[in-house]
Amino acid sequence: MFRGARRADLDAILKIYVRARQAMADSGNPTQWGDHFPPQELLEEDIDSNRLFLYLVNGELEGVFAFILGPDPTYARIEDGKWLNDTLPYGTIHRLASAGRHPGAVITWCLEHCESLRADTHADNKIMQHLLEKNGFTKCGIIHVEDGTPRIAYQKMSLTLPLRRD
């Protein structure tokens, strides 16, 4: 079951991010999120903006992620490639953390809510790269996040897109 996150969920959300940061460090990616990303203030902003979602299985928190519909400023410029489609509206997955027992469920849910889905990840985040590629995302190029660091950019088009004749 998916639902919007609430401030009352913050303790559980913070715990899953602690586990995710540890898993990232254990897999050779200790710097992407460091010790404190995402900060609680950003999560509260995501909650207040109705863009932080939870994935629950049998009442237990399985995953948390930001799902944002509309243009992402960091995706306006892409290097060493191009987006699969740069004219359709798109959704973006950010700050995905999960217990890892149901890989792909978040991506499937997001694709039910948009025609085009984008994501980005750090070059050292082999787990996320594998998840995206296993779920049919195409590596499109390199974008730079707000602090200027590069990220590998991915995109997937929904398989349920209606035929467009124009």
Question: Would you name each region that the model predicts?
Answer:
Residues 49-67:
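Conserved beta-hairpin
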Residues 95-112, 129-134:
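Conserved acetyl-CoA-binding loop-helix of GNAT-fold acetyltransferases
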Residues 92, 113-124:
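Conserved GNAT acetyl-CoA-binding A-motif
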Residues 120, 138-152:
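Conserved catalytic-core motifs of GNAT/GCN5-like acyltransferases
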Residues 22-41:
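Conserved GNAT-fold acetyl-CoA-binding loop/helix
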